[in-house]
């Protein structure tokens, strides 16, 4: 399956990396690559995430960096909707 990052998801991940980079650019790059690799694996294992809070979505939990990545499967595509840090209040809609 193809993994497609929606614009909001890309902006979310970039913002998290920018925040970390203020203190440590190497750690920010490592986080970015780690999250991207975990999300890209959804192309092979789309049912990896738990059922989502929003109907017709799933959520990949990335414990190492405290992220929740909501996504949905549409046809032969995994659509990455957002990237959220678990210590922040999650929005009601993705």
Labelled PLM ranges:
Residues 2-57, 74:
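Basic, Lys/Arg-enriched alpha-helical interface segments
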């Amino acid at each position: 399956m193809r993994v497609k990052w929606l614009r909001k998801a890309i902006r979310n991940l970039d913002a998290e990396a920018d925040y970390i980079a203020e203190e440590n650019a190497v750690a920010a790059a490592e986080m970015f690559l780690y999250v991207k690799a975990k999300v890209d694996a959804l192309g092979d294992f789309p049912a990896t995430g738990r059922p989502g809070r929003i109907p017709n979505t799933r959520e990949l939990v990335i414990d190492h960096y405290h992220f929740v990545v909501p996504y949905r499967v549409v046809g032969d595509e995994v659509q990455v909707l957002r990237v959220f840090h678990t210590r922040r209040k999650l929005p009601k809609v993705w």
